[in-house]
Amino acid sequence: MNLPSLIPVMTLKGVVFFPQAMLPLRIFENRYQEMLQDILKSERMFAVFAEREISSEDEELNEPPFEVGTVGLVRVSKQNPDGTSFVMLQGVSRIRARSIVQESPYRILETEAFNTIKVAEKLEIREKIYDAMVQNQKLGGDVTQDVLDYLCTLEDDIAFVDLAAFTLCKNTVRKQAMLEVQRLHKRAEMLFDDIMQDNLQLSLRGSCKNQNQDTENDRN
């Protein structure tokens, strides 16, 4: 898909959007309502960039975006009686911000493609990631059977890693770091390490709980 170089953008705190992911949004600010009206008349596309922390007291930019975000396609747009809108945005592609060309009435970025680099035809670590997710489910983690069932149907390794990261990674800074890694194998390794770390914490928590129960039983 050919993307325009100038793309309207929402800069959102704590939201890291990935290609292929579905992001429900409630549009209520005037600037974004105007943006939505404009894009629905054209490509139906806008980008979501996570808002980073202000780097210094001298920085004048409001809502400073990270360098890399994701452009999405509006799949559903429904206006509510109160004037707000419900939007379902599907991620299309990573993009890198080059400059801010407009702030009013809404922000527009000049961007460039930031495509994933896949060196090997087969992602060897994919099976290990899936096994780690199965273990996470058994340990009572965030992985559900629905997540497993959906991810295992994906033939594309890039979509598999991106959707798993979008669904399972809760730390915004870490999630943004995964979004910014171009090499698929490195991104997959980061995802695997996160799941294994979560599994370790869940396992230790379970062991402590069992020990406490055993101690309580001994007292009784």
What are these regions (language model features)?
Residues M1-N220:
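N-terminal low-complexity, acidic/polar interaction/targeting segments
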